[in-house]
UniProtKB/Swiss-Prot annotation:
GO molecular function annotations of the record: G protein-coupled receptor activity
Cytoplasmic-side segments: 56-71, 127-144, 217-251, 325-377
Lineage top rank: taxon: Eukaryota
UniProt cross-references to InterPro entries, sorted A to Z: 7TM_GPCR_serpentine_rcpt_Srab, NRL-GPCR1
A Pfam family this chain is assigned to: 7TM_GPCR_Srab
The protein, known as: Probable G-protein coupled receptor F27E5.8
Topological domain ranges for the Extracellular compartment: 1-34, 93-105, 166-195, 273-303
PANTHER family the record matches: G-PROTEIN COUPLED RECEPTOR F27E5.5-RELATED, SERPENTINE RECEPTOR, CLASS E (EPSILON)-RELATED
Family, per entry: Belongs to the G-protein coupled receptor 1 family.
One Gene Ontology term, aspect cellular component: plasma membrane
Higher taxonomy: Eukaryota, Metazoa, Ecdysozoa, Nematoda, Chromadorea
Organism: Caenorhabditis elegans
Entry's transmembrane regions: 35-55, 72-92, 106-126, 145-165, 196-216, 252-272, 304-324
Subcellular location: Cell membrane
Length: 377
């Protein structure tokens, strides 16, 4: 692709030219990065608060609490990965200096991608944990077997890290393609096409398995709950509690899965849109102005993906608090909006308190006066 005819061409990601670091991060890029960082700060604080809330309540089984907190940790690390990418680019725009390197940006992308994959896989392992709670509902609440969540949490991170290793070893690396054009290291997409397709495949299969598995678990627990034989034996109180909690926790997961489906659909739509205009620019350079109009000089349209992810980071804890009664009660108590609490009354506010300190004769007279008043009315 040849350089533009103008002696000082305007920057565009897929045009050759001698551009400065400040030019390679457009004003639109910088503004979107600032908005994204603001949203991610809110999301990180919410997820930290949710971790504290989940571990502070005993309404959920400890195994489930571990996996939910592991999911929140994935959101936090995903935000950290994005900050590692966005902050050097913002500095490049403001100070016209690139403080990053390919090693730094590869690690940042690895943290971001592995955390995003871990979040998507979290529902699969939560579904497996709820399946175990359904199968062994009689003893699951009393038996403290924490090897399940430890193995599940390990796999939840091992699979994405294994995929990152495969991406690093993939020969179809896109580094040479991106280095042909003026890009800062953190503007390069280090995920190869092969690993991108594998990632999408695993996420889709995991989502289908999560929805199907949670639906089966929910219906199975409803069927157990409607079985009246277990309610007349005090020995089975633990089973009764476990079945009830299985229903409440799986009921919580359906809105979270719906939330994941909505944001995943939006994200994939943005990726398809961005991929289309990138292919147009690389194959039909004459359509330069059209690409600039619909994709942006700095690929601003593709940054909608990061904004959607940041909004998802914020929405996940909010949805969890609203959909689970005990978590919602914890939130209301924390912010002081607790209608369940009974305001303590002072003794002098209680009706008839003044008579409690009066002499016995006065109390007796008052008692018969009240009786006379009631009989005469």
């Amino acid at each position: 692709m040849s350089e533009q005819d103008s002696s000082s061409p305007k920057y565009m990601r897929f045009l050759l030219g001698n551009f400065t670091s400040a030019e390679m991060v457009t004003d639109g890029n910088f503004l979107i990065y600032c908005i994204e960082m603001g949203l991610l700060v809110i999301g990180v604080l919410e997820n930290i608060f949710m971790i504290g809330a989940v571990f502070s309540t005993s309404c959920l089984h400890l195994n489930l609490r571990i996996l939910i907190c592991n999911c929140c940790l994935g959101f936090i690390l995903m935000a950290v990965g994005r900050a590692m990418i966005a902050v050097p680019l913002c500095i490049a725009h403001l100070r016209d200096v690139d403080i990053s390197s390919h090693a730094w940006c590869f690690i940042a992308n690895a943290v971001h991608h592995s955390s995003a994959d871990s979040v998507c896989l979290s529902f699969v392992f939560i579904m497996l944990e709820r399946t175990a709670g359904t199968i062994w509902s009689k003893d699951y609440e009393k038996t403290k077997i924490h090897i399940f969540p430890c193995i599940f949490a390990f796999l939840q991170w091992f699979i994405p890290m294994f995929m990152i290793l495969g991406n690093f070893l993939d020969r179809a690396n896109r580094m040479e393609h991106f280095l042909l054009y003026p890009h800062l290291p953190c503007q390069i997409e280090y995920l190869t096409p092969t690993m991108f397709m594998i990632t999408i495949f695993i996420i889709v299969i995991g989502f289908i398995a999560s929805v199907g598995g949670i639906t089966i678990v929910y219906n199975k627990n409803i069927k157990k709950y409607n079985t009246r034989d277990i309610w007349f034996n005090t020995v089975n109180l633990s089973e009764r509690y476990q079945i009830t909690e299985n229903i409440r926790s799986t009921h919580l997961l359906f809105p979270l899965l719906a939330l994941m489906l909505i944001f995943s659909t939006l994200s994939v739509s943005v990726l398809i849109y961005g991929g289309y205009w990138v292919s147009v620019m690389t194959k039909e350079p004459a359509r330069f102005e059209e690409v600039v109009k619909w994709f942006g000089r700095g690929g601003e349209a593709a940054q909608l993906f990061d904004i959607i992810t940041a909004i998802y980071t914020i929405s996940f804890p909010i949805c969890a608090f609203i959909c689970h009664p005990n978590l919602f009660r914890f939130l209301r108590k924390f912010i002081g909006w607790n209608s369940y609490a009974v305001r303590p009354s002072n003794l002098n506010e209680i009706g008839g308190f003044e008579m409690s300190t009066a002499p016995i004769r006065t109390q007796t007279e008052f008692h018969f006066q009240e009786l006379s008043r009631q009989w005469n009315t």
